[in-house]
Amino acid sequence: MTTPSHAPAVDLATAKDAVVQHLSRLFEFTTGPQGGPARLGFAGAVLITAGGLGAGSVRQHDPLLESIHMSWLRFGHGLVLSSILLWTGVGVMLLAWLGLGRRVLAGEATEFTMRATTVIWLAPLLLSVPVFSRDTYSYLAQGALLRDGLDPYAVGPVGNPNALLDDVSPIWTITTAPYGPAFILVAKFVTVIVGNNVVAGTMLLRLCMLPGLALLVWATPRLASHLGTHGPTALWICVLNPLVLIHLMGGVHNEMLMVGLMTAGIALTVQGRNVAGIILITVAIAVKATAGIALPFLVWVWLRHLRERRGYRPVQAFLAAAAISLLIFVAVFAVLSAVAGVGLGWLTALAGSVKIINWLTVPTGAANVIHALGRGLFTVDFYTLLRITRLIGIVIIAVSLPLLWWRFRRDDRAALTGVAWSMLIVVLFVPAALPWYYSWPLAVAAPLAQARRAIAAIAGLSTWVMVIFKPDGSHGMYSWLHFWIATACALTAWYVLYRSPDRRGVQAATPVVNTP
């Protein structure tokens, strides 16, 4: 007679011990000398969350604040106080990030340090109202369209009047959804669960972004290891970067899902798990089309695997890799579209970004400069000029991407370099860009751009883009005071890391640009 197995009880006890051990290690790190940047960044995140109640991308009418008699934070002196708290929090978080960056460059930070710090910095932001963007309200309204039997690719939120519509930015109320079926399904899921409750919807939607962050944390060190570069540095660039944490998680952007899925797909592909990698890339495209930039470069990676493992000839390997990748893409995308019950109408909505006019892209910046300098010499219509510069930008993108695809084909490092450059060119020359768009190239460049100059440049650019936008979602690029404050902060960030101590015992990493 056999005795009953106690394996489930043993497994439960083992899991409990593991959780206790991890929490104990996290506590020791947080309270120890290595946890200084983590504690400082946590304080900054708390200030952002507190200040966001009044100065963030708040609702038109906030019954929750009114019910606890805190609505005064949104007006007059209360708004001033909220703004001070929020901007102080941003400054503190940037200081913590730069301080951690100096430790990374000195070789004093580990991957555990990066992961633990991410958890600590993120915790307060999970409770924040949306900051630096009102997009989450549009997401909820678009999800409600699908929930209520309407096609979000055929009608804007205005076609479905409800409580969610009140907080959508006017510019987007008549705009159809420019997102893929996977994200529309996520937004529908949220609105099915919470109904038209904006607060609960915002919190649940933010939680739905967490898998993207987890995938980014998982994939980035693996890509760095595959390329022979420094995992903690890569995590510092693309995960702990306040531009990522504050905008993508604090602001609740679907870029978090897209970037996480895309990076994980790239990591799986370079490790030889090609089918799984292409599936994840396709799901990322079904969140936001930008992830599609990576797909052609991964064909080169798969081609090499077929040649090395199966002895395929170059042309045969290319045709096989391209055909199978295309087949996987079509199949996965068709399934997601069928589940969502939508077609390809979202592709036409991608042009909706032309409504945005700011200096974050070269075409729009060039149009502003030419108009400002030329209006005293000749008559020039700004919007006509803008259409011309944007058309030139699109031509630059259309010419550059195929050239980069062909140029960066030799090995895995080249393929990732090509993806990074392609995404950067798209961000710089697309008709309109927003701060969180810079998370696209950052995620891919993080395992590559690890030379001191590159790290300092990334710190400066990230700081400038972080500071130039306002917590309510507007920007300060037409205010000289705001512009020079952001520029001064960016130069300071660059200098702090450019002059930081050398890494101890760690060989300098390879810069992003490699030779053929």
Curated annotation (Swiss-Prot):
Tell me its family. Answer: Belongs to the MptA/B family.
Q: What does this protein do?
A: Involved in the latter stages of the biosynthesis of the alpha-(1->6) mannan core of lipomannan (LM). Catalyzes the addition of alpha-(1->6)-mannose residue.
Its annotated compartments are: Membrane
Main location (coarse class)? membrane
One of the record's GO cellular component terms: membrane
Among InterPro entries, the record links this protein to: MptA-like, MptA/B-like
Q: What is its EC number?
A: 2.4.1.-
According to the UniProt record, list the residues that bear N-acetylthreonine: 2
Kindly state which keywords UniProt assigns to this record, in alphabetical order: Acetylation, Glycosyltransferase, Membrane, Transferase, Transmembrane, Transmembrane helix
Top-level enzyme category:
transferase
Name one molecular function that GO assigns to this entry.
Answer: mannosyltransferase activity
| Topology with respect to the bilayer | Multi-pass membrane protein
Q: What is this protein called?
A: Alpha-(1->6)-mannopyranosyltransferase A
Q: Which gene encodes it?
A: mptA
Q: Does the keyword Glycosyltransferase apply?
A: yes
A Gene Ontology annotation in the biological process aspect, one of them, is: glycolipid biosynthetic process
- Kindly list the residue ranges recorded as spanning the membrane: 38-58, 78-98, 112-132, 174-194, 198-218, 232-252, 278-298, 326-346, 350-370, 385-405, 414-434, 454-474, 477-497
